Amino acid sequence: MQKLQIFVYIYLFMLLVAGPVDLNENSEQKENVEKKGLCNACLWRQNNKSSRLEAIKIQILSKLRLETAPNISKDAIRQLLPKAPPLRELIDQYDVQRDDSSDGSLEDDDYHVTTETVITMPTESDLLAEVQEKPKCCFFKFSSKIQHNKVVKAQLWIYLRPVKTPTTVFVQILRLIKPMKDGTRYTGIRSLKLDMNPGTGIWQSIDVKTVLQNWLKQPESNLGIEIKALDENGHDLAVTFPEPGEEGLNPFLEVKVTDTPKRSRRDFGLDCDEHSTESRCCRYPLTVDFEAFGWDWIIAPKRYKANYCSGECEFLFLQKYPHTHLVHQANPKGSAGPCCTPTKMSPINMLYFNGKEQIIYGKIPGMVVDRCGCS
């Protein structure tokens, strides 16, 4: 009897000791599972973020039709950037992106960049050198962006050096042509008279839309132009070949082309932040920093909000194509699960140098994730 009592006491003691330990182990195991799930979600989001950044690099080069990033140094950019009103306005009033989260439309989107403004700098031409020992300027090569779009505006910008006394300046733009019988090599394009006062130099724009359209129709007629801006004493004030201290004052062409609007349809999605515990498909913030890439050839924006999609796509949460849920129910083994992907993308405006050192201002489609969904 005494042995039985001792055994019972030992058994009860073991229950008292072992019981709480067992409960604590279950609690710790459950907590570890929850932490592991959260860590896996964070890791998954980090992987999606990294993949999105790499995809953006590839997309930008592809949509700009560049095989590699242009190799232009910061010093070269400072020399090439025109110090002209239209370019300063583009930079100063630059709309980094259009990200209206309240608008739930899904935009149809072309793949390649839709150019709005192209700034073309003059290049060297053997034809001009043949006409005179020191060509006065200028020969312009036109990219396919100009050739394959409707030109709505074209302006030649020239910089006139400052004057010490009030004077009248006679500006003349001449087009180089094939030699005529009398030896004539030029024909007039535009001429104008300006009154200048002492002070700083000025930028002057001249409409050359008609000439540009003719050049595009007949490329062989584009032999170059000459710029003259003579004051009352016969001094040429036009900066055609910048001297030291005149960097960024080269003549250039500003060409605007059309942009065709697209139709749209409706869609919806979830928005989250990096601290969110949402497990479903959601849009997360992501800032792309071009300076961190070493992409100095992008003038603006230096950074923009691209966003990315991440999260689970259970069929209960399916948003974009409800019929997929029915397909899965009919054949669960033969249908793949939905993925968390962008359902609404919007463009960004970009000012950049292309591979030919031309300055392009254009709209790049599909660079900002506005909505995410399961599809």
Curated annotation (Swiss-Prot):
Glycosylation site list: N48, N71
Annotated PROSITE patterns: TGF_BETA_1, TGF_BETA_2
UniProt site positions, description: Cleavage: R98, D99
Subcellular location as annotated: Secreted
Chief place where the protein resides: secreted
Gene3D superfamilies reported in the protein's UniProt record: 2.60.120.970, Cystine-knot cytokines
Signal peptide: 1-23
Post-translational modification: Synthesized as large precursor molecule that undergoes proteolytic cleavage to generate an N-terminal propeptide and a disulfide linked C-terminal dimer, which is the biologically active molecule. The circulating form consists of a latent complex of the C-terminal dimer and other proteins, including its propeptide, which maintain the C-terminal dimer in a latent, inactive state. Ligand activation requires additional cleavage of the prodomain by a tolloid-like metalloproteinase.
Disulfides per UniProt: C272-C282, C281-C340, C309-C372, C313-C374
Keywords: Cleavage on pair of basic residues, Cytokine, Disulfide bond, Glycoprotein, Growth factor, Heparin-binding, Secreted, Signal
Gene Ontology CC annotations of this record: extracellular space
GO biological process: cellular response to dexamethasone stimulus; muscle cell cellular homeostasis; myoblast migration involved in skeletal muscle regeneration; negative regulation of insulin receptor signaling pathway; negative regulation of myoblast differentiation; negative regulation of phosphatidylinositol 3-kinase/protein kinase B signal transduction; negative regulation of skeletal muscle tissue growth; positive regulation of DNA-templated transcription
Propeptide: 24-266
One annotated GO molecular function: identical protein binding
The family this protein is said to belong to: Belongs to the TGF-beta family.
Subunit and partners: Homodimer; disulfide-linked. Interacts with WFIKKN2, leading to inhibit its activity. Interacts with FSTL3.
Function: Acts specifically as a negative regulator of skeletal muscle growth.
Protein name, as recorded: Growth/differentiation factor 8
Gene, per the UniProt record: MSTN
